[in-house]
């Protein structure tokens, strides 16, 4: 890292952008025209990605578009896809650091950018330039990177400008942030530059809309025109009318109100009747039932509906939002919701309580009386976009949508926005019909993409009256070469006072709502493919609204029915449509207390927070006086609770323009002149940037160098005295630990530098994080995690991190290069560790002292020493041994937690041990069977894997028993809360969230834990199964058999794909080394290494054991331990293709199971003893 002159960086960016625009021999590919702008693209010759160029013309001077771009706050107004734009810091008159956030037309998560922007005028060549480059800034975490890009404004005639925009985008930015890894979605980006093609046309439309001759007159006076004021109303307001209105306001308030009503009605409701008389007074407008009345109140336009039949319940104007907004405000607000759910749901207070196929359901407690619900997902529908669109918010909604029983268009405000009146059934009282007025927007993007967004017209404070408040939600319909992908983001708020939960548990309410939402999407998919079936339906088959009166009946239906994916209209286990007389008898029977309501909810994995997951958990600080501190715009305050106001981020969609856009003080906004002496009106200031590895730029820190380095007494009497501290520090970062220690002994100056914690941090990342995996989480690498961040939300592990892989990927067809990840160019910052439940944090736990270590100025030095100590003890086998005694039978399974150890034995007991005291905390008797499997104990451990039990389902772990029972054990209460039983004998289990594998004798079966149904089964003839394991690819299961083979079971095809032959004895155990390699242990006293891409023979055959190998455990592809009847062998897997035996630990009893992490090892023996080896003991 080194400081560079900021203007040198700007000059290099300027030269690169100028080359891309003016070099005419580049083989550009013409992508067509979009709104009179031509779009071209070319493959980036220097890296994977594309370069897009968009060209258009406008009849103005270059000065106008140059200054529109100069005001960064304006882009969120004129750019339809820009969610937020803000100036972070003005370096000088021509250079600034600005923040931008852009939504994705494909429904992906928003992308944040921090740009260093430079403005210049080349008046000799009649052109002006804006060049940008991505940088890092301390106020914006993890922005998206974009290569140098920019604009050219070329004056081709006295009042005509050609605008050229060139943007370099890499493949990572091109790829949409969706769960579906669709090649067609990426092709849309590559073939159209869909986000780039909107920018220039939007700029041209904005200038044409607001550019008037009155503004041209202001240019001659060198004043900033109102065009560049972000407080300017975006509508085409006639200045003369405004002046007349102001004069009328001074003369007669009544006349002023009448004029404002008429003028604003013309400006904001474009689809008004063409023969409407503009001179009608307010009384004539009030008497019209088909029109709304727009009044000016406190400088804000609000919609005042009339007390007519259509708007009889909207009689309070203070409860209405302003609908006079940009055509894509719904798209921008929905994009914020996507960012909340897809990027950081925990930090924004969301809890993922259920996953089902492509559906993910979230909730959060907004306040004590209301709850937010959200559903996110995407699906493929083999139908055209027009057909799919016709079933969403249309006359067919009441036949398809399980929420809606009526839909009517009240008013068409313009070509994009309309008001819809929706009638829907109540959840808690299904016979009741509620009504709501929604604001709906339909946007048509390039390539036929349709965006349909909606939200409630009323303010959230009316939730007490209606029971529901619809937040910005949307459907994205994305055409493909065949069919469409529909992306849905559904979010609303429910009024549920605490008294409701006493009658209907929250779990039941959320489950019913999730099933209703899923049924709606499935209906849209089904009838879009088979539209002729819809017209044959004479009545609603689902969910029998006419026969349901209470929520308990509705919950009972949803707990028993099964919605078929192929034909959702045919409901399995759906109750018949009984008459009202029979239903009334049942209700009286239940109300009398003879048979209390007992709802059987399927065993969906729910994860509720204990009060901490409310919307009030995320906070946004207000803007400060420092220009370097970035803070988001002020959020809309909660109407019911001031403590939760900061979470209402997406509910500020329709606030007034002044509140939303007044980000910076625009009185000091400079103005650039397109003239020969333009530089005389600006000021230049030098600035420095800190460049790191030539990739990203960082703003220089304001901290001064340590005082002791400035002392004249500390000198080396060498050339080092002439070098700046940053350069000396960089030189020292290239040394290893041995040379750093030697240099620290030469002089006091070098000693102080060698103690710099930044040097040891870089050395630590270089030495110990190069082989770490990034696919899962693991607690054991706590030293790689920044423990300084406190009070973090509880991490919701219902998010399936294994989905980072492609569902269609196969280990048999993957390339060999994918097995070894390349190290990052820059050491990533340490990720924050989530806060664990209080029940798992103890004062005597050794991990609690790590936070005190980090506060030390030599934190990374101490961490490096600790890591070296662990490696040294591991190589020598000198771990501190603690024996855990208490079991009376052989150990069948064991697992480590942050401060606990769990063990299961053949003595039919399950024990929990405290790591610090090595004492048994609790003993649970598992009936007449023994515990044989834990949750996650059949998975390979990686360096980033966090212990799953304490974070999953409120500290619930599943225990597999030999009699086939699955018991749910609560770590906090140390009791069995629930028991499932859908098989009667088992030798082992593999738990994978909803899927459960069980093997016994010669069969392996796959069950659905929610429905308790058998999904797949494979039977292997003439052998017995000893062990099963699943690696990175969840659709492949490795099976160790007594016939001396290892078989790979393809779960999708239910076939044995390959067989590994080579062992001369029964294969007893196996573990995965990486994605494609595994190690097996056999009764022939050998361990073998295999590569399933080349299964003909083993890679290595290692003979180091004196008896049959019974257990194997691998940690992070770095270390391995194997156990037989007499000893435990420790192996090093780093830096060599073949495992390297480090040491052998002799034991008095045969080993039954092993488990290791970075610092410790657990061994369970046949005599019931458990040994705990701590390699970090000094």
Swiss-Prot record:
Residues covered by the START domain: 1-208
Bias (Low complexity): 229-293, 571-580, 809-820
Gene3D superfamilies to which the protein is assigned, alphabetical: 1.20.1280.50, 3.30.530.20, YVTN repeat-like/Quinoprotein amine dehydrogenase (2.130.10.10)
F-box domain segment(s): 717-763
WD repeats: 886-923, 925-979, 981-1017, 1020-1059, 1062-1100, 1104-1141, 1146-1178
Lineage: superkingdom: Eukaryota
GO function term, MF aspect, one: lipid binding
Protein name per the record: F-box/WD repeat-containing protein A-like protein
């Amino acid at each position: 890292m080194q400081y560079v002159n900021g203007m040198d960086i700007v000059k290099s960016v300027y030269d690169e952008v100028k080359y891309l625009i003016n070099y005419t021999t580049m083989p550009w590919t013409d992508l067509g025209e979009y709104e009179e702008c031509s779009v071209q693209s070319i493959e980036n010759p220097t890296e994977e990605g594309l370069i897009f160029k968009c060209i258009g013309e406008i009849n103005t001077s270059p000065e106008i578009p140059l200054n529109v771009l100069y005001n960064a706050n304006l882009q969120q107004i004129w750019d339809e896809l820009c969610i937020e734009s803000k100036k972070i810091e003005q370096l000088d008159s021509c250079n600034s650091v600005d923040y931008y956030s852009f939504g994705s037309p494909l429904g992906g998560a928003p992308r944040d950018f921090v740009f260093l922007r430079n403005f210049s005028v080349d008046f000799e060549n009649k052109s002006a330039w804006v060049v940008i480059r991505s940088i890092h800034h301390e106020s914006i975490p993890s922005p998206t990177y974009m290569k140098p890009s920019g604009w050219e404004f070329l004056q081709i005639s006295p009042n005509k400008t050609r605008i050229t925009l060139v943007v370099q985008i890499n493949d990572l930015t091109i790829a949409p942030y969706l769960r579906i890894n669709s090649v067609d979605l990426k092709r849309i980006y590559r073939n159209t530059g869909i986000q780039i093609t909107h920018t220039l046309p939007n700029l041209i439309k904005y200038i044409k809309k607001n550019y008037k001759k009155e503004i041209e007159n202001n240019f001659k006076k060198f004043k900033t025109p109102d065009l560049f004021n972000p407080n300017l109303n975006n509508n085409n307001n006639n200045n003369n009318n405004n002046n007349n209105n102001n004069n009328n306001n001074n003369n007669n308030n009544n006349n002023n109100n009448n004029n404002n009503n008429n003028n604003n009605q013309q400006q904001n409701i474009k689809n008004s009747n063409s023969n409407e008389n503009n001179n009608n007074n307010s009384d004539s407008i009030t008497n019209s039932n088909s029109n709304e009345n727009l009044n000016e109140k406190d400088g804000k336009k609000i919609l005042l509906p009339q007390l007519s039949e259509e708007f009889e319940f909207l009689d309070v104007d203070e409860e209405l939002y302003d609908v006079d907004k940009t055509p894509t405000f719904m798209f921008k607000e929905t994009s914020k919701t996507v960012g909340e759910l897809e990027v950081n749901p925990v930090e924004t207070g969301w809890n993922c309580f259920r996953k089902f196929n492509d559906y993910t359901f979230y909730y959060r407690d907004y306040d004590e009386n209301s709850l937010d619900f959200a559903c996110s997902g995407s699906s493929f529908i083999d139908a055209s976009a027009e057909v799919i669109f016709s079933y969403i918010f249309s006359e067919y909604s009441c036949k398809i949508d399980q929420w809606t029983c009526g839909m009517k268009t009240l008013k068409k405000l313009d070509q994009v926005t309309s008001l819809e009146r929706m009638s829907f059934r109540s959840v808690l009282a299904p016979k009741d019909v509620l009504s709501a007025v929604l604001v709906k927007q339909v946007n048509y993007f390039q390539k036929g993409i349709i965006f349909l967004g909606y939200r409630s017209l009323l303010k959230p404070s009316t939730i007490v009256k209606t029971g529901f408040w619809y937040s910005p939600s949307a459907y994205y319909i994305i055409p493909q070469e065949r069919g469409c992908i529909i992306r849905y983001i559904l979010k609303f708020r429910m009024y549920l006072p605490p008294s409701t939960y006493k009658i209907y548990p929250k779990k039941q309410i959320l489950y019913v709502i999730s099933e209703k939402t899923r049924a709606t999407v499935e209906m849209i998919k089904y009838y879009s493919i088979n539209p002729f079936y819809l017209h044959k339906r004479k009545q609603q088959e689902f969910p029998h609204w006419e026969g349901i009166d209470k929520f308990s009946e509705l919950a009972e239906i949803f707990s028993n029915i099964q919605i078929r994916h192929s034909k959702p209209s045919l409901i399995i286990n759906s109750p018949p449509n009984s008459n009202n007389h029979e239903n009334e008898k049942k209700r009286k029977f239940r109300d009398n207390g003879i048979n209390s309501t007992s709802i059987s909810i399927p065993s969906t994995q729910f994860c509720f927070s204990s009060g901490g997951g409310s919307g009030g958990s995320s906070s946004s600080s207000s803007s400060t006086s420092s220009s370097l501190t970035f803070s988001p715009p002020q959020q809309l305050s909660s109407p019911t609770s001031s403590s939760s106001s900061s979470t209402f981020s997406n509910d500020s969609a329709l606030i007034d323009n002044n509140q939303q856009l007044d980000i910076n003080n625009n009185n000091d906004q400079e103005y650039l002149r397109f003239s020969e002496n333009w530089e005389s009106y600006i000021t230049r200031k030098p600035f420095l940037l800190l460049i790191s590895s030539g990739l990203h730029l960082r703003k220089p820190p304001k901290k001064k160098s340590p005082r002791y380095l400035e002392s004249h007494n500390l000198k080396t009497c060498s050339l080092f005295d002439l070098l700046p501290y940053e350069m000396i520090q960089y030189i020292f970062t290239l040394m290893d630990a041995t040379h750093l220690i030697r240099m620290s002994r030469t002089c006091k100056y070098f000693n102080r530098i060698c103690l710099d914690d930044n040097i040891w941090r870089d050395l630590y990342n270089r030495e110990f994080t190069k082989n770490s995996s990034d696919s899962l989480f693991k607690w054991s690498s706590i030293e790689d995690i920044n423990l300084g961040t406190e009070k973090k939300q509880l991490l919701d592990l219902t998010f399936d991190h294994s989905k980072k892989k492609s569902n269609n990927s196969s280990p048999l067809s993957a390339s060999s290069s994918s097995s070894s990840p390349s190290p990052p160019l820059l050491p990533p910052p340490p990720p924050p560790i989530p806060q664990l439940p209080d029940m798992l944090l103890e004062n005597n736990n050794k991990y609690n002292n790590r936070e005190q270590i980090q506060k030390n100025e030599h934190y990374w030095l101490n961490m490096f020493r600790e890591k070296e100590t662990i490696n040294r003890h591991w190589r020598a086998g000198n771990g501190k041994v603690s024996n855990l005694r208490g079991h009376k039978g052989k150990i069948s399974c064991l697992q480590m937690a942050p401060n606990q150890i769990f063990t299961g034995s053949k003595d039919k007991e399950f024990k929990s041990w405290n790591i610090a005291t090595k004492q048994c905390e609790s003993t649970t008797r598992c009936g007449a069977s023994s515990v044989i499997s834990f949750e996650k104990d059949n998975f390979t451990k990686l360096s980033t894997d966090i212990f799953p039990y304490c974070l999953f389902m409120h500290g619930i772990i599943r225990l597999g028993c030999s009699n086939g029972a699955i018991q749910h054990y609560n770590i906090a209460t140390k009791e069995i809360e629930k028991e499932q039983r859908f098989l009667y004998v088992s030798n082992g289990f593999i738990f994978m969230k909803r899927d459960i594998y069980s093997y016994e004798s010669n069969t392996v079966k796959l069950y659905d834990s929610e429905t308790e149904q058998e999904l797949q089964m494979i039977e292997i003839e003439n052998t017995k199964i000893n062990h099963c394991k699943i690696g990175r690819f969840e659709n492949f299961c490795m099976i160790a058999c007594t016939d001396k083979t290892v078989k790979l079971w393809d779960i999708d095809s239910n076939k044995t794909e390959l067989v590994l032959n080579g062992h001369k004895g029964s294969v007893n155990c196996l573990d995965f080394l990486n994605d494609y390699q595994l190690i097996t242990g056999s009764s022939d006293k050998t361990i073998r290494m295999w590569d399933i891409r080349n299964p003909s023979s083993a890679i290595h055959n290692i003979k180091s054991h004196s008896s049959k190998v019974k257990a194997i455990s691998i940690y992070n592809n770095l270390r391995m331990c194997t156990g037989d009847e007499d000893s435990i062998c420790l192996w090093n897997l780093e830096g060599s293709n073949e495992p390297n035996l480090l040491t052998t630990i002799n034991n008095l009893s045969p080993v039954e199971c092993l488990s290791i992490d970075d610092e410790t090892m657990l061994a369970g023996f046949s005599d019931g003893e458990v040994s705990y080896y701590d390699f970090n003991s000094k």
